Amino acid sequence: NDFLAAEGPISMFDERVIKNYPSKGNLSVTCLLGDDVIYNEPMVKKNWILELGDTTIVGYNCKKASCNFRGRKWTVWYTLDIPISEGPWKIDGLPGMILKAVDSLNQFSFECFQIKTNLNIPMTVKVAKCIKTTALKVHKLKMLRESNYTAYSKLVGDDKGVIMGYVPK
């Protein structure tokens, strides 16, 4: 399957999320078992709690909010100066751009370090061969990778075709 992906290799712990506008839905690309896999999933509406607190990130005044998403409590800082309901990874849904997001266990942290505008530079993409799968299969493999990396790494043989739902060539 041909897929347009941003330049650069996808590492084993990397995930790219391409948001499908104007329709809703995420197209995610990640590396599992040594292959780039692709899957669709719906965009999930988050139940944000607007909190007291503000800060400045890359020159933008930001407000604080939090929500539970994917089993984690996320605290974010967003700016109304960029009225785009977007943010890092799959974190979105506020009235402004999310410039920082941290989970409560400090296992994941995203922070904007620079914003450039009016660059007039074309976006470059490269065609990558990706294996279509489902979000559920990817989730199960990620859970196995996190809980038992030895068992996960043994799947790199012929068994991975059965797990991912494809037959290797």
Where would I find each of the regions flagged by the language model?
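Extended soluble regions of mature proteins
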Residues: 1-169
